[in-house]
Amino acid sequence: MLHKAEGFDRRKFTMAGILVAMGVVYGDIGTSPLYVMKAIVGDNGGLARVSESFILGSVSLIFWTLTILTTIKYVVIALNADNHGEGGIFSLYTLVRKKSKYLIIPAMIGGAALLADGVLTPAVTVTTAIEGLRGIPAFFERFGNDQTIIVVITLTIILILFSVQRFGTELVGKAFGPIMFLWFTFLGIIGLMNFSQDWTVIRALNPYYALQLLVSPENKLGLFILGNIFLATTGAEALYSDLGHVGKMNIRISWPYIKICLILNYLGQAAWLLTVKENPEMQALAEINPFFQMIPRGILVFGVVFATIAAVIASQALISGSYTLVSEAIKLKLLPRLKIIYPGSNIGQMYIPAVNLILWLACSAIVLAFRTSTHMEAAYGLSITITMLMTTILLLFYLLDKIPAWSAYLISLFFAAIEVVFFFSSAAKFFHGGYVAVGMAVFLLCIMIIWERGNEIKEATAEQVSLKKYVPQLKALKEDTSVPMYQTNVVFLTSDRVDGEINRNIIYSILDKQPKRANVYWFVNVQVTDEPFTQEYSVDMLGTDFIVQVQLYLGFHISQEVNVYLRQIVHDLMKTGRLPKQPQRYSLTPGREVGDFQFVLIQEELSNVSELKKWDRQIMQAKLAIKNLTTSPESWFGLEYSEVKYESVPLIIGPQRKTHLVERKNRS
């Protein structure tokens, strides 16, 4: 089934798709002009220490970074690596994971780094935009260089932004596209106005100036200047991650306009810098932001407001992207289950309360700790270089199936070499605040490792039994009137996907722990497919009319509301005569033919008799501890309003520790 988002076909070029792309895909990269040249000039010692060749070289590096990484790697190559229309590092992983079990490592590292570095985006973009208020005379006269008012305004905007997430962004989201189209047009026009004052700045497109700057003594940072240059392309990974919202055609057709507007703005900033670099008043300024300084004074207020709106939209796109990334990681069993809410009519519109709270707290803490955009820029971008490098590794295995091996290795080596240089040039940021993003990435990676390895240990040692072997006992129990009727339908959620086999604990629960007499025994397993929007099922009744093994096939974008799906399956089976009707004498619904349901959820606790390696035992203990802190199976599977019973069973993994007691004889 073709999935449609926002009311348009993602596979085709449409104006609606173009507008959505501008509102969702380009937010991060579209706000980079707010701070990139500011960071480059500031870290070189200010306006008094930059020359013409330095300015031209900086813009040249920006242009070629956008060309090589954003345009060639992502727009031209990576967008082809879509998983049924979905993009991003986890979707790419699902395409190549059969190549090697070790590919889970770059996928986890890249996903954790992308989530962690994203925390800085709302903080740095909104703070930079609000700092533009200082260029307004009335504001400057009232507050001067007082950073506290900037921090307060920024925190207020961030609080409002995260508070409205629970209500969904479907309505306001429709306005994002047109607003960002106007924003990019504004970037291009303002840039062109200043660029037209010195057309010779076009020389910056010559790569000679980029290479010259890297070895020039005028460049105080040397290769480390690339850490600031990289800020111009941090949104490239988000561009690939948001592929599923709009489709590759809409991104590829809209990108040339976006890039032209961005380059015009950077050229305009360069022309403005060349014009004022000898101005003593400008040189005396403690901090200079070419973006706001080059805007005509008469429309500066408009420019600051517009920049703030663009920063909020960019932050919203990142927040939505974080929800999607976490959701995909959960479906791939890389993160524990979290409560996911769908406030809008679009499946892509989701809200994860836990993620929202963590992002808000982290963003607010960063604003309070770093205070100025200059300090935030010094910390920004490090983790994204790691994500890009991990994407390149996964992309290599994708390309090996599409083009000759030598071409795949050559292309991957080319991008990896560039990204390694960017990584080491950004490494200095670790000591200037980059440790925050790296620390968060390591924390998230540890959770992913614990969860993935814990699942691996459990699945490798889980004791499976043949369900068919117990059909006679289940039939006898069903017909044994001496045992009280437990429920008309008893449902067990199983974690295994082996046909005809289930976990031994389930049979133990039915026959041994408390005999559960029922008319129908249901064993339901959910398999997350590589296709994002699959909604299918299959059944195996083992030749009976009282045992139903249900296999749900749900895409990694689909919520696992088992109760809803089970209702449909019951009616389908009754309609075809495979399941007897269950007429109810007492019901609010006259003629109701479906009986009551009891969902039995088995909770596992690590048994002390399990002989596990010390490391594996710690992994399992950590996994179970994390599991207790996250969403319950009842909430995850949409069973909040169903009859649910929890049963605790010992989780015995590996060989059991043997015990031997000796009877003490009575001594008379």
Swiss-Prot record:
GO molecular-function terms, A-Z: potassium ion transmembrane transporter activity; symporter activity
Pfam families noted in UniProt: K_trans, K_trans_C
InterPro entries for this protein: K+_transporter (IPR003855), K_trans_C (IPR053952), K_trans_N (IPR053951), Kup (IPR023051)
Superkingdom field: Bacteria
Membrane-crossing segments per the record: 17-37, 59-79, 104-124, 148-168, 175-195, 221-241, 256-276, 299-319, 350-370, 380-400, 403-423, 430-450
Annotated keywords: Cell membrane, Ion transport, Membrane, Potassium, Potassium transport, Symport, Transmembrane, Transmembrane helix, Transport
Reactions performed catalytically: K(+)(in) + H(+)(in) = K(+)(out) + H(+)(out)
Compartment(s) where it occurs, according to its Swiss-Prot or TrEMBL record: Cell membrane
Topology with respect to the bilayer: Multi-pass membrane protein
Entry GO terms, CC: plasma membrane
PANTHER family from the UniProt entry: K+ POTASSIUM TRANSPORTER, OSMOTIC STRESS POTASSIUM TRANSPORTER
Family to which the UniProt record says this protein belongs: Belongs to the HAK/KUP transporter (TC 2.A.72) family.
Function comment: Transport of potassium into the cell. Likely operates as a K(+):H(+) symporter.
Protein name, per record: Probable potassium transport system protein Kup
Species whose genome carries this gene: Enterococcus faecalis (strain ATCC 700802 / V583)
Lineage of source species: Bacteria, Bacillati, Bacillota, Bacilli, Lactobacillales
